[in-house]
C-alpha cells in the first residue's frame, strides 16, 4: 500500500471536469485507488464517489494506492493532481 498526501491546487477543486479527468486517469490502473478527505473515503474510479467528497481548492487529501507498482502510480497520481486544470 502506498499513501501520499496532496493539497489540491486547482481553482475549482475536484469538481466536474477535473474530477472526470482524475477518474479517467485512475481507471487505467488495475489496482485499487482511494481518496480520503477528513476521514471520508471514496473510490477514485467513481466520479460520484470523488465528487461526494466535496474537495475544494486548498483541501489536503490522502491518496491510497494498492496493487502492482503502487509506489510509482501513487507518485504519478500526485503529479497528475498537481497539474490538473479547470
What feature does the model see in each segment?
Residues 1-5, 60-62:
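Intrinsic-disorder/low-complexity, polar/charged segments enriched in Ser/Thr/Lys/Arg/Asp/Glu/Gln
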Residues 52-86:
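C-terminal structural segments of small proteins and small subunits
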Amino acid at each position: 500500500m502506498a499513501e501520499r498526501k496532496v493539497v489540491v491546487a486547482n481553482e475549482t477543486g475536484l469538481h466536474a471536469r477535473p474530477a472526470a479527468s482524475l477518474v479517467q486517469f485512475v481507471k487505467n490502473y488495475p489496482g485499487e485507488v482511494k481518496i480520503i478527505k477528513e476521514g471520508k473515503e471514496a473510490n477514485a474510479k467513481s466520479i460520484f464517489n470523488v465528487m461526494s467528497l466535496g474537495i475544494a481548492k486548498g483541501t489536503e487529501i490522502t491518496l491510497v494506492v494498492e496493487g502492482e507498482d503502487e509506489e510509482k502510480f501513487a507518485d504519478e497520481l500526485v503529479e497528475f493532481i498537481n497539474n490538473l486544470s479547470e
